[in-house]
Amino acid sequence: MKVIVGLGNPGREYENTRHNVGWWLIDTLKERWHFEPWRKDGDAVSTTGLVGTKKVKLVKPQTYMNLSGSVLRPYLKREGWTAAQDLMVLVDEVAVPVGEYRLRAAGSPGGHNGLKSIEAHLKSPTYPRLRVGIKPVDERRQIGDLADFVLHTMPRDERALVDDITPRMIDAIELWIAEGTEKAVSSMGR
């Protein structure tokens, strides 16, 4: 089973913040794939369905960002399940301009507390992550304090840029599900 974790913070006050782009994307996947409603699942809400012939579970941690890794505990005990092949994390990335994304098979958390928590639970940096850019393209918009920046509502023009790349991100995720990490990552260069 493939597990896709969308990182974000619970609560209405965080719904439209930059830090919740992982939730925006996972909600879009749920709708596109016609999965059932979210259900309580430990420290998360989740839903499961088929994408093609592959069983996929979508997971939204209900902890705050720095505790997100706790949702992985049940999968770490599954025979044959490996994070390198069966997990993808959807996350905001301040080093990538808004309107762009990066798909990597492994990497560092880059100061992201959600990824730090994931890696602490996995005891490994080797798992696919799709980093959705949140860095402003308008140089007049300064990042300043990082925590303040990621927890502020994303302006409409930037949200539109994320919406514009969502179909391409979904294509990359569907390729990962069907053909694996290497194929999905290599398709990014085309």
UniProtKB/Swiss-Prot annotation:
<dbReference type="GO" id="GO:0005737">
    <property type="term" value="C:cytoplasm"/>
</dbReference>
<dbReference type="InterPro" id="IPR036416">
    <property type="entry name" value="Pept_tRNA_hydro_sf"/>
</dbReference>
<dbReference type="InterPro" id="IPR018171">
    <property type="entry name" value="Pept_tRNA_hydro_CS"/>
</dbReference>
<feature type="binding site">
    <location>
        <position position="64"/>
    </location>
    <ligand>
        <name>tRNA</name>
    </ligand>
</feature>
<protein>
    <recommendedName>
        <fullName>Peptidyl-tRNA hydrolase</fullName>
        <ecNumber>3.1.1.29</ecNumber>
    </recommendedName>
</protein>
<feature type="binding site">
    <location>
        <position position="66"/>
    </location>
    <ligand>
        <name>tRNA</name>
    </ligand>
</feature>
<keyword id="KW-0963">Cytoplasm</keyword>
<comment type="function">
    <text>Hydrolyzes ribosome-free peptidyl-tRNAs (with 1 or more amino acids incorporated), which drop off the ribosome during protein synthesis, or as a result of ribosome stalling.</text>
</comment>
<comment type="similarity">
    <text>Belongs to the PTH family.</text>
</comment>
<comment type="subunit">
    <text>Monomer.</text>
</comment>
<feature type="site" description="Discriminates between blocked and unblocked aminoacyl-tRNA">
    <location>
        <position position="9"/>
    </location>
</feature>
<dbReference type="InterPro" id="IPR001328">
    <property type="entry name" value="Pept_tRNA_hydro"/>
</dbReference>
<feature type="binding site">
    <location>
        <position position="113"/>
    </location>
    <ligand>
        <name>tRNA</name>
    </ligand>
</feature>
<keyword id="KW-0694">RNA-binding</keyword>
<dbReference type="GO" id="GO:0000049">
    <property type="term" value="F:tRNA binding"/>
</dbReference>
<feature type="active site" description="Proton acceptor">
    <location>
        <position position="19"/>
    </location>
</feature>
<dbReference type="GO" id="GO:0006515">
    <property type="term" value="P:protein quality control for misfolded or incompletely synthesized proteins"/>
</dbReference>
<dbReference type="Pfam" id="PF01195">
    <property type="entry name" value="Pept_tRNA_hydro"/>
</dbReference>
<keyword id="KW-0820">tRNA-binding</keyword>
<comment type="function">
    <text>Catalyzes the release of premature peptidyl moieties from peptidyl-tRNA molecules trapped in stalled 50S ribosomal subunits, and thus maintains levels of free tRNAs and 50S ribosomes.</text>
</comment>
<feature type="binding site">
    <location>
        <position position="14"/>
    </location>
    <ligand>
        <name>tRNA</name>
    </ligand>
</feature>
<dbReference type="GO" id="GO:0004045">
    <property type="term" value="F:peptidyl-tRNA hydrolase activity"/>
</dbReference>
<dbReference type="GO" id="GO:0072344">
    <property type="term" value="P:rescue of stalled ribosome"/>
</dbReference>
<keyword id="KW-0378">Hydrolase</keyword>
<feature type="site" description="Stabilizes the basic form of H active site to accept a proton">
    <location>
        <position position="92"/>
    </location>
</feature>
